[in-house]
């Protein structure tokens, strides 16, 4: 029996070796497919839903980045502090990712951080990592080993980019620094498809307050308009800062489609002037409402805070006229559209939900007028407009104490506003 087994192994051995692909051929084929996807991405737009959680230590303590990154170090000290959700559209232009709120069709040159304005974010999931690793930063690649994932045989490669070649920046909106980075990826040796990419920053000490940022990206092939494209399915970002706070960001991509009409896709800056200079805005020739006119709105649809996200559109009905002493500009019953720009659950200290709403347009008999307004409150007959740092004040903020994560803001919820000049006209 032992001799028979030995003969069988000797017979199968050459067959197994001959079936294996040369790792360098796999790497070359994968690179070609990845760059082909990058070159064709400007024609496509996807929606990404981003779920974020932040966990922070229950008390202050001192630890080095090396200690904080040890397996399970300090995990018992971390408590869930907050969570929120974003929904955006993402496209690629001039080898850069461009973003807009979902369905807005106006992509911002300033990028994801300027559009959202707060919290942990990463803008590499859709295409930037592709461009950096396989083209711009000229990463160094080495074959690691063959692995089996879900019954599927894959090749694992390692890669690295030193600081002097890196375009990877970490930090906050006010301070960002370049960092070395590296990681690994899994490739299908038969189809040359990229299956999973893992990217980690490499630094022995904190960079712009960040000890480590690690991202895992899962990819799949999508058939669109008689072509196959390698697109992200999901990304998972973990950030550990030097205070011990841990942020986790999960991004899921969906609804990928091609823009057949460039007239519907506007690439430009995020200023209100540029938005109004679009073809649609010029065709409608919108007027501008005078500032300092109070009005009241009610929601026409409920908001389920368990599923809603910043970026989602909302609809309201005007219940009071927008007028001054001599003229009525908009009558009650008009439809007002806007957008959630922040929806956050806070769990520690005083648990609450806070939602930020920005108004966009009012429909007056089929004519849409841009609506610039902010939350309006009155005390003792005197108007009070709270000063806030987020979003330039062109929004309303509403706080609900002690509510559950699936709290519903009911249809008919009343809000009070006052018109203002657009930010670009201040």
Question: What is each model feature region?
Answer:
Residues 4-14:
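Bacterial N-terminal signal peptides
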Residues 15-19:
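Sec/Tat signal peptide C-region and signal peptidase I cleavage site
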Residues 20-181, 189-195, 200-291:
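Structured extracytoplasmic
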Residues 146, 186-187, 361-362:
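Hydrophobic beta-strand positions
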Residues 175-184, 354-357, 404:
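Glycine-rich, flexible loop segments associated with nucleotide phosphate handling
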Residues 182-188, 323-324:
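Active-site and channel-lining beta-strand-loop segments
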Residues 195-197, 201, 220, 284-426:
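Contiguous beta-sheet cores, especially beta-hairpins with glycine/small-residue-rich turns
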